[in-house]
């Protein structure tokens, strides 16, 4: 579908326009086309096959099927995950480790009336399964804000032996049973008043913050029937924030302290959402239709993953944000990327603490 010729403005031209908008944080259709026009002598060598009119780009985003851009984003995600497959995790595990969460993009109900409103507000949810080896999205889904987080589990092809780390918004007993059936492991934070019956008490390391480590059966009206198997309940005291957290897992072999550290790794997905919202265009949209919004989000994800691929393949020591800044200023230059990035080793983030960037990637 994407290769079919569409007059003088191809899907490839459309993709380049949208990536240009993401990498240079353009604000509107007019902003995009005006800036591209200023590079008219360089467009052909950058891959464009013709000039770009505002109405042409608007019409393409309105009418062309967004699934083409989704497929491209998923393909780049697959490539990037392969590159980062041996990336260290920070925990002593050889299996895959994934964090699952969603972020809400607020929209104006008057402009985006096609999104069902909740409490008088419109919005979208970006459901994400993040591969923590490299912090590359593995699965992404765009829904309206009303869709419950736990329903995202139904879309997943679970990998046997891998760990899936979730917050308590994903607690749904019957869906958690899917992980056990697939020989995959979950680590999920639970509610304090979850009904359960204690089957066995395990020794715990108080020095590591472990308050209790128990084998239990869920006994709630829906949880007991939804997950009828024994499960492990771990209480962990976080001394940094002075709070006690309760984790549920179907893995009975890992050290309890390691389970707590696994849950702590879930913070990486929060940093991922923060990064794309700060540095890419997914909070303000250049089109109001569902198709235009989807295209913009998928090209934002593609831009993020392409930067991650460049960073890994070139072995660039610079942060993701530093690379993004360098690319935004040199998109139409002929200087090779390794040369551009070679002097960026000492670049530091100006708006996000360096410790956060190092934790992100």
Predicted regions and their residues:
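Single, function-defining residue in the core of a domain
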Residues: 1-31, 35, 64, 71, ...
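A short structural micro-motif
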Residues: 39, 78-79, 282
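Blade-loop segments of beta-propeller domains
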Residues: 39-46
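Short acidic (Asp/Glu) patches
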Residues: 42, 81-83, 110-115, 147
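Major-groove recognition helix of helix-turn-helix-like DNA-binding domains
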Residues: 46-63
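Short alpha-helical linear motifs
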Residues: 55-59, 80-84, 344-350
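Internal glycine-rich, Lys/Arg-flanked active-site/core loops of soluble domains
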Residues: 60-85, 89-91
């Amino acid at each position: 579908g994407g290769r079919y010729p569409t007059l003088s403005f191809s899907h490839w031209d459309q993709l380049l326009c949208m990536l240009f908008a993401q990498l240079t944080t353009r604000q509107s259709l007019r902003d995009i086309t005006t800036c591209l026009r200023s590079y008219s002598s360089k467009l052909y060598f950058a891959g464009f096959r013709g000039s770009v009119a505002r109405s042409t780009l608007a019409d393409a985003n309105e009418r062309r099927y967004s699934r083409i851009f989704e497929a491209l984003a998923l393909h780049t995600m697959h490539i990037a995950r392969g590159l980062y497959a041996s990336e260290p995790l920070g925990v002593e595990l050889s299996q895959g480790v994934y964090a699952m969460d969603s972020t809400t993009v607020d929209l104006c109900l008057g402009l985006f009336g096609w999104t069902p409103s909740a409490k008088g507000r419109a919005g979208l949810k970006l459901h994400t399964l993040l591969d923590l080896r490299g912090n590359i999205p593995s699965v992404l889904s765009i829904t309206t804000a009303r869709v419950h987080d736990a329903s995202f589990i139904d879309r997943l092809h679970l990998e046997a032996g891998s760990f899936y780390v979730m917050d308590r918004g994903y607690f749904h007993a019957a869906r958690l049973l899917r992980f056990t059936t697939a020989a995959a492991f979950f680590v999920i934070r639970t509610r304090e008043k979850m009904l359960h019956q204690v089957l066995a008490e395990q020794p715990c390391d108080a020095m590591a913050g472990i308050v209790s480590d128990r084998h239990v059966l869920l006994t709630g009206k829906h949880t007991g029937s939804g997950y009828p198997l024994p499960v492990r309940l771990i209480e962990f005291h976080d001394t940094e924030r002075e709070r006690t957290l309760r984790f549920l897992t179907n893995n009975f072999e890992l050290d309890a302290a390691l389970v707590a550290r696994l849950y702590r790794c879930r913070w990486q997905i929060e940093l991922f959402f923060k990064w794309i919202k700060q540095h890419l265009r997914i909070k303000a949209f250049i089109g109001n239709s569902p198709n235009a919004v989807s295209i913009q989000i998928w090209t934002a994800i593609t831009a993020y993953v392409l930067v991650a691929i460049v960073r890994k393949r070139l072995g660039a020591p610079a942060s993701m944000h530093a690379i993004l800044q360098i690319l935004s200023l040199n998109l139409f230059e002929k200087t090779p990327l390794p040369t551009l990035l070679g002097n960026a080793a000492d670049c530091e983030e100006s708006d996000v603490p360096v410790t956060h960037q190092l934790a992100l990637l």
